[in-house]
């Protein structure tokens, strides 16, 4: 089989992932994969650029395409790790912060060629564009007082009044009803409103990147990036920081229950059902027309668990609300008789999902006992 890809000319190295990282990745217990996979600015032998790492075990070839190479797959082919983990890696000299990119994956399955966004991208283009962006997260946090005292604020016996909202439709720019406020503008206006009305916390409908605005964020493609509709990652960091300085906690809706089938997203990522179940009775939601995560696959558990911790680690959030839990817990959710597969005991409980939710809950409270 030939693809037209030339021998890799990108500077490559055996990756930042250690043998221990790979062990945890395979075990499903690596809860900070975002530090290892994805795009990270770096330097090799004194040459500045970006290292890339993507999980695509059923790829015959993989490369990174983007602004730095004219979207040509030839210059920057990735190399598969020799440990059989299915991770492909490479270093692109000269790649810079803010540049757009995708992974070009040639699948072993029927030779399909796919152009995919980065599952671990910290930033994306503003929809309807679909490329990931190289991004180095940086913010000078000013919420030390809140962080030091939030165990008291978030205690179960403390006053708790939550304002649930969708950022895009809460308030529009003056004179532009079809536009959006920036995260920074919303932070100031929202904090004033919440303080005046006596709320202790705000719960945001999903801010994770999503292609379809009409989904209100519940069809996520970017599990490690705030949507670019309202600004940059640093703008959203400012949003959280400002609310904390005004005494308001921030809770995020988080959607590990399903994901859309958009061509640039997680569905059929390497030409196979990688993040989802292959059997539609397990891997496709008939009501929502979306894909269901394979919670029994260790690498998928690590991906989702890393997403959950990421928002606490890098964005100082005070809690996550897991969306559509019932659809995760029950194999027959939204299905008629004969449209679902029982578990190993003949029941309708999704045992892998139950285990996954317990693991994520334990991981979050182990690392952050002071959150909701």
Name each model-derived stretch.
Residues 62-64, 101:
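Short beta-strand elements bearing conserved aromatic residues within extracellular beta-rich modules
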Residues 146-157, 166-349:
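Substrate-binding/active-site clefts of carbohydrate-active enzymes
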């Amino acid at each position: 089989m030939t693809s037209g890809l030339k021998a890799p000319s990108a500077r490559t190295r055996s990756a930042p992932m250690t043998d221990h990282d790979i062990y945890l990745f395979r075990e499903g217990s690596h809860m900070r994969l975002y530090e290892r996979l994805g795009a990270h600015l770096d330097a090799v032998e004194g040459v500045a650029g970006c290292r890339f790492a993507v999980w695509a075990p059923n790829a015959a070839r993989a490369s990174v395409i983007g602004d730095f190479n004219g979207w040509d797959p030839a210059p920057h082919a990735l190399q598969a790790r020799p440990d059989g983990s299915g991770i492909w890696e490479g270093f692109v000299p000269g790649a810079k912060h803010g540049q757009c990119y995708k992974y070009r994956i040639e699948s072993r399955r029927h030779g399909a060629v796919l152009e995919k966004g980065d599952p671990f991208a910290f930033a994306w283009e503003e929809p309807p564009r679909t490329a990931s962006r190289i991004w180095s997260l940086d913010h000078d946090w000013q919420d030390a007082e809140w962080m030091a005292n939030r165990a008291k604020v978030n205690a179960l016996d403390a006053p708790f009044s939550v304002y649930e909202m969708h950022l895009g439709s809460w308030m529009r720019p003056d004179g532009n009803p079809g536009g959006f406020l920036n995260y920074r503008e919303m932070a100031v206006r929202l904090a004033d409103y919440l303080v005046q009305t006596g709320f202790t916390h705000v719960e945001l409908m999903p801010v994770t990147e999503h292609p379809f605005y009409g989904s209100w964020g519940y069809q996520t493609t970017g599990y490690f990036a705030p949507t670019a509709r309202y600004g940059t990652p640093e703008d959203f960091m400012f949003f959280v920081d400002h609310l904390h300085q005004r005494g308001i906690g921030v809770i995020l809706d988080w959607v590990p229950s399903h994901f859309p089938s958009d061509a640039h997203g997680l569905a059929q990522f390497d030409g196979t059902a990688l993040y989802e179940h292959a059997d539609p009775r397990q891997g496709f939601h008939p009501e929502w027309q979306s894909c269901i995560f394979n919670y029994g696959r260790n690498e998928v558990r690590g991906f989702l668990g890393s997403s959950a911790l990421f928002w606490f680690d890098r964005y100082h959030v005070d809690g996550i609300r897991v969306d559509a839990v019932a659809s995760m817990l029950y194999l027959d959710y939204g299905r008629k008789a004969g449209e679902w597969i029982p578990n190993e005991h003949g029941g309708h409980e999704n045992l892998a999902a139950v285990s996954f939710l317990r693991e994520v809950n334990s991981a979050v409270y182990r690392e952050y006992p002071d959150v909701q």
